[in-house]
Amino acid sequence: MNRRTFCKTAIAAGVAASLPLNRLLAIESGALASDIPAVTLSGSEITLEKAAVEEFAGSLRGQLLTPSSGGAYEAARRVWNGMFDKHPALIARCAGAADVSHAVKFAAERNLLVAVRGGGHSISGKSTCDGGIVIDLSPMQGIRVDPERKRAWVQPGVLGVSLDRENEYYGFITPMGTVSHTGAAGLTLGGGFGRTSRKHGLACDNVLAVDIVTADGTLRHANRKENPDLYWGVRGGGGNFGVVTSFLYRANVAGPMVLGGAVVHSIDNYKEVLKFWADFQATATRELYIGVGTFPGPGGDPIVVIDTCWCGDLKKGEKVLAPVRAFGKPLADDIKVQRYVTLQASNDEGLGHGVREYMKSGFITETSDDLIDAIVENRNTSPTAWFFIMPTGGAISDVGLTDTAFPVRNAIGNMMTGTVSPDATQDQAAIQSTRAYWKHLESHTRGYYINLNEDVTEKKTRSNFGPNLARLTEIKNTYDPGNLFRLNANIRPEV
């Protein structure tokens, strides 16, 4: 190599070394080859200039993906619910809070449509968008458990299974859904029901503090003393107020072993099983999670399932669940002592990534004969339809209605139903069959769980927050007056 060639090579290497790695990679991969068409909050079309996108990419520790990024973009744009096949203009795969702040500022300056993705498990597809920016938190997977203080610090890309397993090592449980690959962040912000919630409360009830980037790009800490309004709002108010970059949870002494599993009955005995469940659940102690519903069976025919989890003394649990196991003529009974993390994954296979699902849900405050009749007599007969009542009450009801933003505390169950579509050609049939069934059930409900409902009107969303709406609107006015964070159970600002 002659001196001139060596100098050119050295200069090129020096220039490359001065560029942030991800910007260099983006340029080399062709991801920033041209301007990028995008969509604003109002739906109008704009162009993101190449230079601005390059500068944004250079500010990130994480990776910035565009539609020309190839396989990486294709993988990152996909979400759990396969019904939503959207193509954002940008996906900012954030490595930390600074990246989140840069992404929020970039979006706000351009009035760009924003979706926030934690685990990507949003049933309504709100963790992605067409033409906007996805602030992707999935690379932020840190967990730190403090066994002395019984606390767990968790980043927003963490899935429930990861927190469950980390907690298990120390002998703790934090309620974290009933499907193990659900993202902790979205679950918590909307409330967060789990198999131990009757004993330990909702996921949001276990939040002691958060770090959150608000619409102006500022990173704020929120707890009972610092920014208490934000702390109140993120516990059940969804993603309305910003992007949470870390949660501090209470870690409850529990497990690692629980008694649980399912008892299966014939669909011919559906009404009898529902009535048994209603009577049994009415006197259940808070250590017991016991739900009931119908699901497609192994041969395609529907089956009735009583789903259980006992998180107290195991010998006592055997006695408590004995009547459940003895009732009727079960087709199967797999209740057993098992690891909590194993039971948490028991629903995963049927709810894997890419499933095409449409759902409706609502809270019930009683299981009247009229409700049971409506459930049974109007059953959705689609071969992929399902129905389930998740038990609530217990510790969930210990929290006052206005103590957090979560709007429903007096329910005895969360009634939900849905239909899985085999492919895109059958999506509308799945949607229509679910809606038709729900028409017979909705009048028996009192409010709904914001994490599980699709295509809900703004009027219904506002009504659902009840006495908490005024305070939520005030917080929205303060921290997101332009409604940058609107792909959620949206609280429209009034400024």
Predicted feature locations:
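Soluble FAD-dependent oxygen oxidases
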Residues: 2-495
